[in-house]
Amino acid sequence: MAINPLILLTIFPLFLLLSFTDAGIPRVFSGGSWQTAHATFYGGNDASGTMGGACGYGNLYSQGYGTNTAALSTSLFNSGQSCGACFEIKCVNDPKWCHPGNPSVFVTATNFCPPNLAQPSDNGGWCNPPRSHFDLAMPVFLKIAEYRAGIVPISYRRVACRKSGGIRFTINGHRYFNLVLITNVAGAGDIARTSVKGSKTGWMSLTRNWGQNWQSNAVLVGQSLSFRVTSSDRRTSTSWNIAPSNWQFGQTFVGKNFRV
């Protein structure tokens, strides 16, 4: 059967549009180049002092982040947009305090290291803008440097986050205010935007409340819920109908994660 040329003329431009639209979106997160900064530590031997934090993850043990975590300075934290991002870090250029062989550690951004403007940036105000600084959980700091060092020079780079299981969506709030905590994000690890769809609604954008807590004022009670997450590398993961219509506030639902 012959193909109508008019159909080809209609389809071909659409194909080109879709091709160019998707061309710049990577299949997997590729990370970034090596950069320099400094690192200190906090939270105690068991990292109990790192719980909670400005990303809103709460108990980092039960959420799966463990002790391989970091608080980021203002320039790196980016008003919470870097929450969930993963970094490879190694102690460098300080043979007195760096461990032999300059081993790498991999950490997830879970907190904010606030500036101390009463102190100079090179003597106590380590997290003052515009410095790039990592305040590591103590156990992970000790994997790259000696305790007595206090502060060490490092090299760091963004890397893909490797997580076990799917993206987790914890729904808090009440009937007229939904606060969704999103955790365990693989790939880029961070979240650029997210949206929710009820079984009786279209897709609705959520707004960042703080850290990785995202809010909606829509009434979603009694509807099954789907979620869509887009990370900073523009990849999108859609989790269809993961919350049943009888979901309750405080429950966590697991969706589809990004490929790594």
From Swiss-Prot:
InterPro entries: Expan_Lol_pI, Expansin, Expansin/allergen_DPBB_dom, Expansin_CBD, Expansin_CBD_sf, RlpA-like_DPBB, RlpA-like_sf. SUPFAM superfamilies: Barwin-like endoglucanases, PHL pollen allergen. Transmembrane segments: none annotated. CDD domains: DPBB_EXPA_N. The keyword Transferase does not apply. Keywords: Cell wall, Cell wall biogenesis/degradation, Membrane, Secreted, Signal. It comes from the Eukaryota. It is found in: Secreted, Cell wall; Membrane. Belongs to the expansin family. Expansin A subfamily. This is Expansin-A16. The gene is EXPA16.
